[in-house]
Amino acid sequence: MAVNETAEVSVGGEQMAIHTSRPDGADKSPAIIVIQEIFGVNNNIKSIAERFANEGYFAAAPEMFHRSGSGIDIPFSEMEKAFAERGKLSGDNIEDDVQATIDYLKNNPNVDASNIGIVGFCFGGMVSYLGSTNTDISAAAIYYGGGILPRPDAAEGTPRLLDATADAVQAPIIGFWGDQDGGIPVSNVEEIEKTLKAKGKSIENHVYEGAGHGFFCEDRGSYNEAAANDSWPKTLAFFAEHLK
């Protein structure tokens, strides 16, 4: 049974809560950072952290929206509010939050600090991709990470995160995508893979037919049971290979 707790760390002089879930009685466990969607660290994200704990990992889900307050949990129906919160975060903010979470894990007696992975969903998938450039991260899993390449409807000249960061990727990546995701066309997924492989990076992508954005979240209308049930064991196998 997992032990669920909340810690607080300082980021730029502000407090950030980190929701943790770890194996009961475990000495040192490999760790996985679980990055939220644009809705905050809600019950879905906390349950994913607990699922990882039940598989033997110390899971840590930082509240990336802490600059707007603690415990932010935006309803799935309030997309405009969710995008507004995400829009407040700069690249430096994201990097600082991830590093603060890593530092917390490295100083935690229950964590094997040499084996830290990261997984993220939606906005968090992009954060997980960025995490793969951090030398403290040993493996990164991306679930429909938006923003690595511009959306099809993005304004001309929108920055291409992939171009700016691909050279720095150092951790192996596994990605899970839906072919019905309106914001992330399969052509983007293919370009991400082609670009990274051309630079000698390790990436393995899985694209699910009929699945849309948010297919892993049981609480969303976009939940796709087949895609969710196939991606989870693949995620566990990936982390077991690189973190255990």
Sequence positions of predicted segments:
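N-terminal cap/leader regions of alpha/beta-hydrolase-fold enzymes
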Residues: M1-K244
